[in-house]
Curated annotation (Swiss-Prot):
Its main location: secreted. One of its GO terms (molecular function) is identical protein binding. Residues 1-20 form the signal peptide. It comes from Xenopus tropicalis (Western clawed frog). The gene is agr2. InterPro entries: AGR/TXD, Thioredoxin-like_sf. PANTHER family: ANTERIOR GRADIENT PROTEIN 2 HOMOLOG (PTHR15337:SF1), ANTERIOR GRADIENT PROTEIN-RELATED (PTHR15337). GO terms for biological process: positive regulation of cell-substrate adhesion. It is found in: Secreted; Endoplasmic reticulum. This is Anterior gradient protein 2. GO terms for cellular component: endoplasmic reticulum; extracellular region. The keyword tRNA-binding does not apply.
Amino acid sequence: METVLKTLFVLLVATSLTLAKDLPQATRVLQTLSRGWGDNLEWVQTYEEGLYKAKTENKPLILINHRNDCPHSLALKKAFAEHQGIQKLAEEFVLLNVVYDPTDKNLQLDGQYVPKVVFVDPSLVVRADLPGKYSNHQYTYEPADIDLLFENMKKALILLKTEL
């Protein structure tokens, strides 16, 4: 009886291993922190981590609020990722993109909308002086505004150096 049980156990284990190997592996797209905004850049995972790195590394933070189902967010993401100047200059920033608005009221500035790009300096002050071109949604950018975003990134770095 004991021999039969051992044999059945070995047979059960062997069958399980064989079946497990034959199951097709589900194809899954690897999701990185960049979410397509710049795969070669270093991104932080949370707002708190972004603030900490901005302060300790003495770099401004770029916070991008967006949604994966928003056509305006998707268009800006494409323009941001394809702009070589932005991709190069972004290396001088702490980068965070979130698919929701953080609970920090300082970042709501002029309302809840996406896409929204906000700069935070290393002293943890939101840079309200670096808006986009729209008066009703001051921190939004469209693909046609990508050069303005690039200029605001440059200003965030220049002002950082003169303020500290």
